[in-house]
Regions:
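N-terminal intrinsically disordered/low-complexity leader segments
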Residues: 1-22, 29, 208-209
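Hydrophobic/aromatic residues within well-ordered alpha-helical segments
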Residues: 23, 76-80, 84, 105, ...
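Amphipathic alpha-helical packing segments from all-alpha helical-bundle domains
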Residues: 85-89, 128-163, 191
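Hydrophobic alpha-helical connector segments
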Residues: 88-115, 164
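Hydrophobic/aromatic-rich alpha-helical bundle segments in the mid-to-C-terminal region
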Residues: 121-125, 150-199, 208-209
Length: 209
């Protein structure tokens, strides 16, 4: 059997996958823009509307999101964390100090969360359904954090990772509840969130002492 036809077939498959991935990202970017538009109610946003906004056919959009908006929410987390992982891996190639890697990981997640804005707020409150449907992130962020903590202090890695995880989720919950019209929740702005996440590592290491 000649190997050349296989190479051509592999090339076609790679191009098809690249096209699929490009369209998928275009659709997700469209969804993020719509969810962050204050003039549009999130409940009114549909797969069809996302497709129209992206300049993609509705049939193509449903090929990417067969289970409606649940697929969109899952993709927001998946693509968002992929971006974080790519940035972290590039940073790790520079052989940083273990503490710098942990801080960079947390800061990168926080910046990605802020970048996605209301889209991630809306998706977060569907997280149970996302997990149950198998559309959650491939590679749990906590596992990445724990691995980074082991590089920092192998003996107390579990406790350090747990403390960081709790502090991070506390900040994230408050940011998720941000509401400019309500005094209590109005202070948990994007700036507040990024600043407080940046302080988590120092707070967690103090708890360990």
């Amino acid at each position: 059997m000649s190997i050349e036809p296989l190479k051509k077939q592999d090339g076609r498959l790679l191009r098809a996958q690249r096209t699929y991935d490009d369209v998928h990202k275009k659709l997700i970017d469209s969804a993020v823009e719509l969810f962050n538009n204050p003039l549009i109610s999130p409940d009114k946003i549909s797969v069809s509307q996302v497709a129209k906004h992206a300049g993609v056919s509705v049939a193509t959009a449903y090929n990417h999101f067969p289970e409606n908006k649940l697929d969109i929410y899952g993709s927001l987390f998946q693509l968002g964390f992929k971006d974080v992982a790519d940035e972290l891996n590039a940073f790790l190639e520079t052989a940083p100090e273990p503490s710098a890697a942990i801080k960079m990981f947390l800061d990168t997640i926080a910046n990605k969360v802020v970048e996605l804005g209301n889209a991630i707020r809306i998706a977060w409150f569907e997280v149970r359904d996302i997990q149950a449907s198998g559309k959650w992130i491939q590679g749990e962020p906590y596992d990445v954090l724990k691995s980074l903590c082991k590089n920092y202090d192998s003996e107390s890695a579990d406790d350090l990772a747990d403390d960081i995880f709790q502090l991070f989720n506390g900040c994230t919950f408050l940011w998720l509840r941000y509401d400019p019209s309500y005094p209590v929740w109005s202070k948990y702005t994007d700036e507040w969130y990024v600043e407080n996440v940046n302080e988590i590592f120092e707070k967690a290491t103090k708890i360990q002492k």
